[in-house]
Amino acid sequence: MNNITGLNEKRNFLFNIVVPFFNCENYIKKCLDSILKQSYKNYQVHIVDDCSSDNSYEIAATICSNKENFRIIKNSRRMGALNNIYNSFSTLIEEPTKTIDLIIDGDDYLYSSDVLNFLKEKYTQSNCLITYGSHLSSKGIQGKKYPNFIRKYNLYRNYFWYASHLRTFRHDLWLSI
């Protein structure tokens, strides 16, 4: 990882968004609409249906039809979220140092139209390599910030339900694995 440097300068970069899902017909429209409503428009979306048995694929396909930056795949058999994410991030990226990978599950959504702008600022203001977010559940329960002692002693895995499902990281970090 010696070659990974920060995105300190203000520049446009690409969000490489992966939406893996299985049987999300009640949620996938809200998820994809939340991406379409983003004020920051430099993104591509890889939607991966993991062999759903409901109408999830049809709903997603209708939403992303005629959108050049959306690609949808339907697996013929269950592959699992990790496999779908790996395959999506293994596609050729022209400028990996200017690309941020983002994973959002098909039953989640971006709360605000400024989420991508917010993330862009976080990546350009520091040498940020990876982010995790907080969350607000449909019942109004908000995720918590990690207490200082958890951060100090790197105890993240011992404290569940603090971070959300929204995960982002630099694509060049992905390539260095």
Question: Which sequence ranges carry the predicted segments?
Answer:
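Nucleotide-sugar donor-binding/catalytic module of glycosyltransferases
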Residues: 1-177
